[in-house]
Amino acid sequence: MSWAGKILRVNLSTGTVASEPLNMAWAREYLGSRGLATKYLVEEIDAKVDPLSVDNKIIWATGPLTGTMASTGGRYTVVTKGPLTGAIACSNSGGYWGAELKMAGWDMVIFEGKSPKPVYLSITDDVAELRDASHLWGKSVWETEAELKKSAQDPLVRVSSIGLAGENQVLFAAVVNDLHRAAGRSGVGAVMGSKNLKAIAVRGTKGVGNLVNPKEFLRVTAEKKKILAENGVTGAGLPTYGTQVL
């Protein structure tokens, strides 16, 4: 497994960003991005919190295989209390963003509070800071991604952002990364908008370590990929019809 061993905690109300160790006991017990982030969420918020209030939290999480060559190793999960149902929202997305966060040295980002103005979080390896996003507010996710890559002068920056639906707290608003990938379930984008959080731009150059036996890992990964390719659902159904076949 490949845990970086640390998370970012961002207080949008105060504008502070802090590093803290990943709870490894929880990481072992609640395996995977969805389970681990949900554990953090239920421990930190009141079950009756208004999803669009300042007291709700929203988490971007990776899992122990994120950033590796394992199948689905590029995925990440956004977890919060969702405005669409009032239940825990776990929305998953593919692309490069999840792996980039892991390669920057982080397993998870937890946002709490609410910013008084539009902001985005910039992460470059160990350096993370909140920046003004007033110039991005009102722009589409495609415009936002292009602008952040241009300002960073780096086409490999990966961006997870909201568009106008999220800004206006539409209850089914998505979070979009890599132009066409979306955490599209349960209105996680609306929670992002309620906090005046426009985007997270991340660039990682550290790679992914901590594999105990890389050679054996690659062998098993190739074996499992073959099984998935030969399965009617994962091998043919998903590429053709998407998640509606599940």
Each language-model region and where it sits:
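Intrinsically disordered, low-complexity segments enriched in small residues
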Residues: M1-N92, A99-L246
